[in-house]
């Protein structure tokens, strides 16, 4: 093909392009004209050859680029597969070690899982689920009888406390991050360099938890239904961005939820407290305390309620302090029982129902001295002693509310 083009440029082309017109041209002029045409055609062919070479070179370059990209993709894929296999092997080995009879082996497994999750962002929720599952395993809070059993019990306790500390270390906000910045901390892109793990949920249903200190906890959601909290429980400044469930949970010592924020539905139905604090706690989407029991005092001063606040059939065996609490929506204390001091001091009206609420004893003079001897009910409510039992009384409204204004039935949380 190249020879034909060259022959055309050197012989045929000049002859075709110079044969007309030929009148009046000398032989020398014809020869010069053919040479000029020949030179032009050769230059054109050279240009085409250069252009073709460039096209071929570029095509070859692009093909090489595609081949290199394909090789890199395949190498990356192979590398990821190797990494995944390695991570899975480490994960399976650590999980297997959690069932080991020796406590030091179980402790090593916990730390291995935490390190694995720190370096592999996609494994964090899975590792948290494993730690929660370990804490949900049966565990007796009572001391064992024999020395050998006591030693085993003590070792098991240390393993469980380590699991709790690892969770707290990665799910509680750093000290330099305030509770007000919890939302930004949750929205931040997870990083291998950050100790805090955003986007995590907890499931500790039925778990036995000891000295559960999770001040500054920040999670999407958490379920502690039927959990048993031994010793002190600290949730100061905690933030629950989704559902928070404590249904049927029991706290055998002080439980502190001061300045905690509950952004979603919150369920404390049937929970049992010894002494509890919810000072300045915020419940944004409804809280249910139905049939909860407070064996000693509960302090809910300055707490805020953005949705329904349901305290139906709650038993307050000690003091119940709601000073300066703010209820944006309706609140109900229907059929609740108050046995100690009570205070509902507030600078804003309280829209609450106390129908059927019981007061034991009905008169403040039977209470012990001090703050527990004070009872300050919301305006419009007073205690009416029972005719049959002078040690009992019922809260009644001085000015009955219009039936059309009675709080509608409260919807329950979505978790049963």
Language-model region placement:
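Transmembrane signal-anchor/signal-peptide helices with a preference for the extracytoplasmic
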Residues: 24, 49-82
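N-terminal leader/targeting and pre-domain segments
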Residues: 68-71, 77-80, 85, 89-107, ...
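Short hydrophobic membrane-inserting helices
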Residues: 1-52, 70, 286
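Alpha-helical architecture
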Residues: 41-44, 58, 100
């Amino acid at each position: 093909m190249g020879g034909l083009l060259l022959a055309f440029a050197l012989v045929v082309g000049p002859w075709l392009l110079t044969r007309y017109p030929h009148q009046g041209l000398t032989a020398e002029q014809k020869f010069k004209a053919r040479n000029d045409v020949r030179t032009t055609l050769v230059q054109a062919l050279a240009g085409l050859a250069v252009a073709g070479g460039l096209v071929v070179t570029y095509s070859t370059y692009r093909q090489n680029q595609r081949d290199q990209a394909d090789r890199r993709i395949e190498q990356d894929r192979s590398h990821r597969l190797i990494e995944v296999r390695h991570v899975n092997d480490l994960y399976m080995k650590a999980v297997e070690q959690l069932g080991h009879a020796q406590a030091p082996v179980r402790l090593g497994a916990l730390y291995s899982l935490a390190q694995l999750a720190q370096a592999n962002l996609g494994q964090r929720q899975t590792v948290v689920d494993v730690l929660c599952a370990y804490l949900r395993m049966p565990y007796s809070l009572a001391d064992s009888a024999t020395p050998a059993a006591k030693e085993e019990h003590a070792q098991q306790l240390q393993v469980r406390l380590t699991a709790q500390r690892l969770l707290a270390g990665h799910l509680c906000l750093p000290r330099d991050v305030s509770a007000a910045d919890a939302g930004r901390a949750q929205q931040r892109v997870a990083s291998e360099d950050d100790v805090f793990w955003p986007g995590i949920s907890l499931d500790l249903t039925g778990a036995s938890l000891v000295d559960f200190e999770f001040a500054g906890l920040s999670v999407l959601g958490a379920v502690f239904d039927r959990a048993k909290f031994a010793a002190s429980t600290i949730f100061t400044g905690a933030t629950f961005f989704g559902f928070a469930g404590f249904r049927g949970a029991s706290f055998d010592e002080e439980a502190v939820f001061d300045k905690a924020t509950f952004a979603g539905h919150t369920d404390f139905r049937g929970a049992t407290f010894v002494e509890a604090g919810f000072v300045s706690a915020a419940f944004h989407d409804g809280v249910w305390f139905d049939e909860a029991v407070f064996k000693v005092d509960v302090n809910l001063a300055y707490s805020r309620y953005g949705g329904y606040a349901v305290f139906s059939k709650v038993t307050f065996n000690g003091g119940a302090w709601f000073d300066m609490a703010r209820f944006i929506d309706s609140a109900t204390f229907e059929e609740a029982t108050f046995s100690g001091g009570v205070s509902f001091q507030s600078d804003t009206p309280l829209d609450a129902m106390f129908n059927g609420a019981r007061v034991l004893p009905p008169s403040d003079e039977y209470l012990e001295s001090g703050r527990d001897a004070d009872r300050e009910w919301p305006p419009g409510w007073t205690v009416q002693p029972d005719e049959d039992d002078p040690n009992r009384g019922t809260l009644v409204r001085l000015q009955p509310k219009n039936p059309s204004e009675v709080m509608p039935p409260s919807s329950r949380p979505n978790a049963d």
